[in-house]
């Protein structure tokens, strides 16, 4: 599986103006942090306002911002 697995449509489209930095929703989608990807749900969930890191591949290998926890 790709980073932050795309589990909905397997089709990921980055929002307008988003750069291709870090995989956010899966192999086909490379969106910058904070950018929306239509048709995707991120499997890895970080607590509060924390964001899932670039190396996230799911709940068992979840990497969040420093000081944040994952579920």
UniProtKB/Swiss-Prot annotation:
Binding-site residues for Cd(2+) 6, renumbered to this chain: 52, 64, 68, 70
Entry-linked InterPro entries: Metalthion_mollusc
Residues reported to bind Cd(2+) 1: 14, 18, 31, 35
Superkingdom of origin: Eukaryota
Annotated Cd(2+) 3 binding sites: 25, 29, 31, 40
Binding site for Cd(2+) 2: 18, 23, 37, 40
Induction description: By cadmium.
GO molecular function, one term: metal ion binding
Keywords, alphabetical: Cadmium, Metal-binding, Metal-thiolate cluster
Signal peptide extent: none
Binding-site positions, Cd(2+) 5: 46, 50, 52, 56
Subunit and partners: Homodimer.
Biological role stated in the UniProt entry: The metallothioneins are involved in the cellular sequestration of toxic metal ions.
Family as reported in the entry's similarity comment: Belongs to the metallothionein superfamily. Type 2 family.
Name of the molecule in the record: Metallothionein 20-I isoforms A and B
Organism: Mytilus edulis (Blue mussel)
